[in-house]
Amino acid sequence: MRRQRERKSMPDAVKKVYLIHGWGANRHMFDDLMPRLPATWPVSAVDLPGHGDAPFAQPFDIEAAADAVAAQIDTPADILGWSLGGLVALYLAARHPDKVRSLCLTASFARLTAAEDYPEGLAAPALGKMVGAFRSDYAKHIKQFLQLQLLHTPDADGIIGRILPDLARCGTPSALQEALDAAERADARHLLDKIDVPVLLVFGGKDAITPPRMGEYLHRHLKGSRLVVMEKAAHAPFLSHAEAFAALYRDFVEGV
């Protein structure tokens, strides 16, 4: 795990923010969000193992990914995780509580696939159909994914133009497959009652990948959490509703 992009703070900054991307992406997914966060915050966006420029020398493991992020943190930090990155953030908070001051989980999950005791999850065929497109032609489908997320968003073409060239460098194919397999196997529900930090949950009302019911499950099981559903957003609220998302997150962190 490498800390790839870091924005230095002003001398009086006291908050450290770490941004953790989702499957099939890399740190550049946050390129449009970072400038909207307070200039006094030191913000680091990381690449998960095998994604972006991060090396991949072992099977992808959610717990190991969380440990790698923890190794970069020297004082309790505010963690924002998107999709798979939110799952990593849950493991980080449970395994390294001394490293986490607050959590923001956006379009994320404790478990991705449905089970008898977890109807909130996705049916396996639906999940397979969604990820199959990315496997067949990543560059094509990541652009289509962004276009769908930013539908009706002002300057959508500009946002896509800024982040797509770097985002399309998706990383190691074997790592992406292993990360997907790990996400499908993972079940962090048993960790939720161990997490004792402020939690903000932000979901998109139109998200078909991690629908709001997954956020409702997290909200019920993470004590003291706050759930916000952006009704017109889909799987990337921090892109499609960047200003509103940044303001929401800023107020949350400032209030911790």
Swiss-Prot record:
It comes from the Bacteria. It is an enzyme of class 3 (hydrolase). It is found in: Cytoplasm. The keyword Cytoplasm applies. Coiled coil: none annotated. One of its GO terms (biological process) is biotin biosynthetic process. One of its GO terms (cellular component) is membrane. Pathway: Cofactor biosynthesis; biotin biosynthesis. The active site is at S83, D207, H235. Its EC number is 3.1.1.85. Residues 17-241 form the AB hydrolase-1 domain. InterPro entries: AB_hydrolase_1 (IPR000073), AB_hydrolase_fold (IPR029058), AB_hydrolase_sf (IPR050266), BioH (IPR010076). Substrate binds at W23, S83, L84, F145, L146, Q147, L148, Q149, H235. It catalyses: 6-carboxyhexanoyl-[ACP] methyl ester + H2O = 6-carboxyhexanoyl-[ACP] + methanol + H(+). Its main location: cytoplasm. The keyword Hydrolase applies. One of its GO terms (molecular function) is pimelyl-[acyl-carrier protein] methyl ester esterase activity. Keywords: Biotin biosynthesis, Cytoplasm, Hydrolase, Serine esterase. Monomer. The physiological role of BioH is to remove the methyl group introduced by BioC when the pimeloyl moiety is complete. It allows to synthesize pimeloyl-ACP via the fatty acid synthetic pathway through the hydrolysis of the ester bonds of pimeloyl-ACP esters. Belongs to the AB hydrolase superfamily. Carboxylesterase BioH family. This is Pimeloyl-[acyl-carrier protein] methyl ester esterase. It comes from Neisseria meningitidis serogroup C / serotype 2a (strain ATCC 700532 / DSM 15464 / FAM18).
